[in-house]
Amino acid sequence: MQSWSDTALPTVPGAGPPLRLYDTADRQVRPVAPGATATMYVCGITPYDATHLGHAATYLTFDLVNRVLRDGGHDVHYVQNVTDVDDPLFERAARDGVDWRELGSREIELFRTDMAALRVLPPREYVGAVESVEEVVEFVQKLLANGAAYVVDDPDFPDIYFRTDATEQFGYESGYDRATMERLFAERGGDPDRPGKRDPLDALLWRAARPGEPSWPAPFGAGRPGWHIECSAIALNRLGPEFDIQGGGSDLIYPHHEYSAAHAESVVAGRRFARHYVHAGLIGLDGEKMSKSRGNLVLVSTLRKDGVDPAAIRLGLLDGHYRQDRMWTDAVLEAALARLARWRSATALSAGPAAHDTIARLRQHLADDLDSPKALAAVDNWVTEALDYGGSDSGAPAAIAEAVDALLGVRL
């Protein structure tokens, strides 16, 4: 699957400090320690109702990760998937009277357009579930062979499930207790009451073919992949075990990321799926959770059609720390627009205060668990000094503009 167009990054003199990120599994901020090439997998969209601000906040988070790693001298092998085979997609297509493939293609193209407008650096590999079905089939065969998976006793629909007890460390990523897992499993696409399962928390690996649903051939019977196994297969086949960062929204911690890791660790024993599990907070609207069911999604494409500068959307989302749940309001957007205007006014000056210390602080704050609020404040301080008192460094405005572009993804 084709990604979106790349964005040229300005070169900022020197190199940024090593990146430190909060690891959900370890419950602490610790160094990211990649080799020359950093490896990162981020869970992509299910292509309907794209791209709302919750999506945007997640992909901006990992865009910052990408930029900070590059600024630190690393190449970045970034993989992102698209869940273009899933029940919510089929349900939306049926509701709207369109083919699910047509709906998926349309929403994926809109997502690409939104990401390019927000100046999100594209993944090196952008992989759809449909194009990776054969990989999933091979993965399920391995899980069946080593006893980590089983077929339910159902002659009509012999679905294949993952044994939750296949790994001793299951649950290490989320740290949730059994009661919390049971509640979230039911709320987030699980099927705890499916007859024939050995444990209510066992997760679907392969859904046997049903009338009216798409299916693909497999040695164990035609069907389609479960949700979690798609990411396990795509990530392992492109990045290998113990890649540097798995990322997504905090609503993916459980069940999706917990099971993706468990599937992989059942095949590659003794090695963690990823070295860092990193999760972005959720975005609400005017004091309420933003969700499809509430009908209060704010779409990037709608804001763009209304004439909102994508750079302001980006600044508005970066004004809160990535790990915190936060609200989108008119006041947030107005503040972002005002900040963008001030930054552009200051960097358009013929001279300004020296830029070196500001760029160093910008780098340091971003390397410290992506502290974007402090990073924005560092630029604000330079801008205020430039507008209020001027300066004699003729290269400073351009240097600040290039650093803001390269590190924050905001073109001034």
Curated annotation (Swiss-Prot):
Zn(2+) binds at C43, C231, H256. It comes from Nocardia farcinica (strain IFM 10152). The keyword Transcription regulation does not apply. CDD domains: Anticodon_Ia_Cys_like, CysRS_core. A motif ('KMSKS' region) lies at residues 289-293. Belongs to the class-I aminoacyl-tRNA synthetase family. MshC subfamily. It is an enzyme of class 6 (ligase). Its EC number is 6.3.1.13. InterPro entries: Cys-tRNA/MSH_ligase, Mycothiol_ligase_MshC, Rossmann-like_a/b/a_fold, tRNA-synt_1_cat_dom. Catalyzes the ATP-dependent condensation of GlcN-Ins and L-cysteine to form L-Cys-GlcN-Ins. Monomer. GO terms for cellular component: cytosol. A motif ('HIGH' region) lies at residues 45-55. A motif ('ERGGDP' region) lies at residues 187-192. It holds the Pfam family tRNA-synt_1e. One of its GO terms (biological process) is mycothiol biosynthetic process. One of its GO terms (molecular function) is zinc ion binding. It comes from the Bacteria. Binds 1 zinc ion per subunit. Keywords: ATP-binding, Ligase, Metal-binding, Nucleotide-binding, Zinc. This is L-cysteine:1D-myo-inositol 2-amino-2-deoxy-alpha-D-glucopyranoside ligase. L-cysteinyl-5'-AMP binds at C43, G44, I45, T46, T58, N81, V82, T83, W227, G249, S250, D251, I283. It catalyses: 1D-myo-inositol 2-amino-2-deoxy-alpha-D-glucopyranoside + L-cysteine + ATP = 1D-myo-inositol 2-(L-cysteinylamino)-2-deoxy-alpha-D-glucopyranoside + AMP + diphosphate + H(+).
